[in-house]
Design a protein with these regions (language model features):
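Hydrophobic transmembrane alpha-helices
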Residues: 2-67
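Membrane-interfacial segments
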Residues: 33-37, 41, 63, 67, ...
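Membrane-embedded alpha-helical hairpins and interfacial helices in multi-pass inner-membrane proteins
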Residues: 114-190
Length: 190
């Protein structure tokens, strides 16, 4: 019986590069939208969440392994903490949201299902927004009126995330179509 060779590494180098590039692109593009958009206005909130969610959906279509979303969240929060001074208190909430999304994808049939990345990102976006509101409530429970100001901002951001789900699927379909067209065109040149 031939011995089977087991891969010691869960993610390949290509998958880790894809994850890192998409994480950096998501953080950089949302930062640029915030700077160009002039801060926290509804248009820039929608655009930031739309771009972030689109990139996350496309990345999950590229790297279809359990745990990818959690690793993306870790890398993204690390970039946020180092570059932007992001709050460390959001890391447990984001990891819990990533765990809920990973569990939803597994319960729905696994990462190989065609709609699994969209489901995972939808659950992640919803639970991360809810958990971040929970963290905000924890810090502002002496003055709950401040939380009333935050809720509409989070809701506007989630609308952008919902739009990003559809644009992420569309971007992946367009990219897949370009790969097929490229594969058909290259043999004709040679």
């Amino acid at each position: 019986m031939p011995s089977q060779v087991f891969n010691r590494h869960y993610w390949s180098a290509r998958e880790l590069v894809v994850l890192g590039v998409f994480s950096a692109a998501a953080k950089l593009s949302t930062l640029l939208v915030a700077l160009v958009g002039g801060g926290m206005n509804p248009v820039s909130l929608l655009a930031k969440n739309l771009i972030f969610t689109t990139l996350l959906v496309v990345m999950l279509y590229k790297v279809r392994k359990p745990g990818t979303l959690a690793l993306f969240v870790l890398v993204n929060m690390l970039i946020s903490m180092l570059l932007l001074g992001g709050s460390v208190t959001l890391l447990p909430a984001m990891l819990l949201a990533a765990g809920c999304a990973e569990a939803a994808m597994v319960c729905a049939g696994g990462m190989r299902k065609p709609w699994a990345p969209v489901l995972g990102v939808a659950v992640y976006d919803l639970t991360s927004k809810i958990f971040s509101l929970g963290v905000s409530w924890l810090f502002m429970r002496e003055s709950p009126a401040l939380l009333y100001v935050i809720v509409p901002i989070v809701v506007i951001g989630y609308v952008g995330s919902l739009c990003g789900l559809f644009s992420g699927v569309r971007a992946d379909e367009i990219q897949s179509l370009l790969v097929v067209m490229d594969a058909q065109f290259i043999p004709q040149i040679r």
